[in-house]
């Protein structure tokens, strides 16, 4: 195939590119600065590199101003993210994470929207011990953050449960294949001996990434229709499993999704991935690699906010990018096969799997595993992990599946669920069961407003409106993020709130219930009083005027309340 004439955008490299180039494959001076006793933080250059190792330097923003008044440095702490491909963890791994959360972190575990674990509040002096314990449990934090391929997602509880093992295996293979090859991680955290001599020549240590890795983060997810729980179109690469006659026939390939944008900058926008073809299962790892290398070579390394793959595709053209992918593969993708998505939520409660096994999906509000005064969630899960013989699966909706429970073990697990009052969410409204929120304040440095701490309280008030209109069991997706970067995939929710300032949010409406359409800006910079007033009007109209089976996101478009977004490039129109 002839080489397509593509070019990377002009402009000087960003400072992050300099940091990566000079880092000697992610080493920087991390080994030294993490040992420096004079500060609980680390320099900015090393913090940029720290992300590749799976950690962010943060501080407690609740006390930041008071600390400044006292002329004290911020209360620095580290967030550590554990990559768990497909969200699968053993009971032994769960117990390790539980112990680390209580010993070194803030006493809680965060289940993320990318099926990973997060520990918050880890002090600098405890980071290395935490990293070593995580690796001792056969998990890793390498490439959980940074300009690399992140945690690979996959549906943890498909309707065709026999397909899960195969799809999960491919998710793991993709994840392993795209891990950075540098020894820096092992040297710094696991006391591996340093590589002798001078640093290797460019490309030798990173055969896929090269010395400057990717222009920006890169995300991959695998969906198994009819469930779109991974929000496959939000991914840089979305693989849609095609199951024929109960067997995995292959994957449709979608490219160029991404949720992030910048307030006030219309050159930034969310975008949905577009399907470009089909590949067989044994081709999926190669396809993922070749697609990622196109972004490596042609992505924007000058402007970080325009560096995601979605902008590369929109700049070069979908067909040109597809041709370049196929040129690198040396063969053409097949024709995309039919598929259908029904929803993007979880299947709560007990679901029967194959070979006499059962899966229990637990509702975990905000993905936060902790012991509350009246709800010992963390303790209950710890006790279950001690006797569980299957696995745990973190869902893309921040919930948890106690999976592969044998019929013999089920009564014991049921007894512990009952003892600790662990809930499948059925006592809550369908709206709350379909809610997502990012961490935001007080630890995220990018947050402009609350999300995880505020959404449950806002839902208490929205639920009064829901009940007034007889919509308690109506499935509506609602999501909140503290900034427009989109960690909770906000613009794929039928109702979305994006933090603009403390107590103020932009409100979006009209995304598809099954994650196949973006939402549209409806109101800007509004507070709680106006949010509730708008929702009272909207939900009242929906209850009275909806068609049979019509979802809320579809209704607001049909009723002319917001315009339909047909592509990310017209998101701001």
UniProtKB/Swiss-Prot annotation:
Gene3D superfamilies: Sulfite Reductase Hemoprotein, domain 1. GO terms for molecular function: 4 iron, 4 sulfur cluster binding; heme binding; metal ion binding; NADP binding; sulfite reductase (ferredoxin) activity; sulfite reductase (NADPH) activity. [4Fe-4S] cluster binds at residues 438, 444, 483, 487. Its EC number is 1.8.1.2. Binds 1 siroheme per subunit. Binds 1 [4Fe-4S] cluster per subunit. NCBIfam families: CysI, PRK13504.1. The gene is cysI. InterPro entries: CysI, NiRdtase/SiRdtase_haem-b_fer, Nit/Sulf_reduc_fer-like_dom_sf, NO2/SO3_Rdtase_4Fe4S_dom, NO2/SO3_Rdtase_4Fe4S_prot, NO2/SO3_Rdtase_4Fe4S_sf, NO2/SO3_Rdtase_FeS/sirohaem_BS. It holds the Pfam family NIR_SIR_ferr. Pathway: Sulfur metabolism; hydrogen sulfide biosynthesis; hydrogen sulfide from sulfite (NADPH route): step 1/1. This is Sulfite reductase [NADPH] hemoprotein beta-component. The keyword tRNA processing does not apply. Alpha(8)-beta(8). The alpha component is a flavoprotein, the beta component is a hemoprotein. It comes from the Bacteria. PROSITE patterns: NIR_SIR. Its cofactor is siroheme; [4Fe-4S] cluster. It catalyses: hydrogen sulfide + 3 NADP(+) + 3 H2O = sulfite + 3 NADPH + 4 H(+). One of its GO terms (biological process) is cysteine biosynthetic process. Component of the sulfite reductase complex that catalyzes the 6-electron reduction of sulfite to sulfide. This is one of several activities required for the biosynthesis of L-cysteine from sulfate. It is an enzyme of class 1 (oxidoreductase). Transmembrane segments: none annotated. It comes from Geobacillus kaustophilus (strain HTA426).
């Amino acid at each position: 195939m002839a080489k397509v004439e593509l070019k990377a955008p002009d402009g000087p490299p960003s400072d992050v590119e300099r940091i990566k180039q000079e880092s000697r494959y992610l080493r920087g001076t991390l080994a030294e600065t993490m040992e420096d006793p004079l500060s609980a933080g680390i320099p900015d250059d090393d913090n940029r590199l720290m992300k590749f190792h799976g950690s962010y330097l943060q501080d407690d923003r609740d006390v930041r101003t008071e600390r400044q008044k006292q002329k004290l440095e911020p209360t620095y702490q580290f967030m550590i993210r554990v990559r768990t491909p497909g969200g699968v963890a053993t009971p032994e791994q769960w117990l390790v994470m539980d112990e680390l959360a209580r010993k070194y972190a803030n006493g809680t575990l965060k289940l993320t929207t990318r099926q990973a674990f997060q520990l918050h509040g880890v002090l600098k002096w405890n980071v290395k011990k935490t990293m070593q314990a995580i690796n001792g449990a056969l998990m890793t934090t390498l490439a959980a953050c940074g300009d690399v391929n992140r945690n690979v997602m996959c549906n943890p509880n498909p309707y065709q449960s026999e397909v899960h093992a195969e799809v999960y295996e491919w998710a793991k293979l993709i994840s392993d294949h795209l891990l950075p090859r540098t020894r820096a991680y092992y040297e710094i955290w696991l006391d591996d001996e340093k590589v002798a001599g001078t640093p290797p020549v460019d490309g030798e240590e990173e055969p896929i990434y090269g010395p400057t890795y990717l222009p920006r983060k890169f995300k991959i997810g695998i969906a198994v229709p009819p469930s779109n729980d991974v929000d496959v179109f939000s991914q840089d690469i979305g693989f849609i499993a095609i199951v024929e006659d109960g067997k995995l026939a292959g994957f449709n390939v979608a490219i160029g999704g991404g949720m992030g944008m910048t307030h006030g900058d219309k050159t930034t926008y969310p975008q949905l991935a577009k399907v470009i073809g089909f590949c067989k299962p044994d081709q999926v790892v190669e396809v993922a690699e070749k697609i990622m290398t196109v972004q490596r070579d042609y992505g924007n390394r000058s402007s970080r906010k325009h560096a995601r793959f979605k902008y590369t595709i929109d700049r070069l053209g979908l067909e040109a990018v597809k041709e370049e992918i196929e040129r690198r593969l040396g063969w053409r993708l097949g024709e995309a096969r039919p598929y259908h998505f029904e929803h993007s939520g979880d299947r709560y409660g007990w679901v029967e799997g194959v070979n006499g096994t059962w899966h229990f999906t637990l509702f975990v509000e905000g993905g936060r595993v902790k012991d509350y005064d009246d709800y010992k969630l963390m303790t209950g899960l710890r006790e279950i992990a001690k006797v569980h013989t299957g696995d745990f699966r973190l869902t893309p909706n921040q919930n948890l599946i106690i999976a592969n429970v044998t019929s013999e073990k089920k009564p014991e697990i049921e007894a512990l669920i009952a003892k600790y009052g662990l809930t499948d969410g059925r006592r809550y409204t369908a709206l709350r069961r379909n809610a997502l929120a990012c961490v935001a304040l007080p630890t995220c440095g990018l947050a402009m407003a609350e999300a995880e701490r505020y959404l449950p309280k806002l839902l208490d008030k929205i639920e009064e409106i829901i009940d007034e209109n007889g919509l308690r069991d109506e499935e509506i997706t609602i999501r909140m993020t503290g900034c427009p970067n989109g960690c909770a995939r906000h613009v794929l929710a039928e109702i979305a709130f994006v933090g603009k300032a403390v107590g103020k949010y932009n409100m979006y409406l009209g995304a598809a219930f099954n994650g196949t359409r973006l939402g549209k800006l409806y109101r800007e910079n509004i507070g709680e009083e106006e949010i509730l007033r708008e929702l009272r009007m909207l939900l009242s109209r929906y209850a009275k005027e909806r068609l049979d089976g019509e979802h809320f996101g579809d209704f607001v478009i049909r009723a002319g309340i917001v315009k339909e977004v047909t592509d990310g490039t017209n998101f701001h129109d």
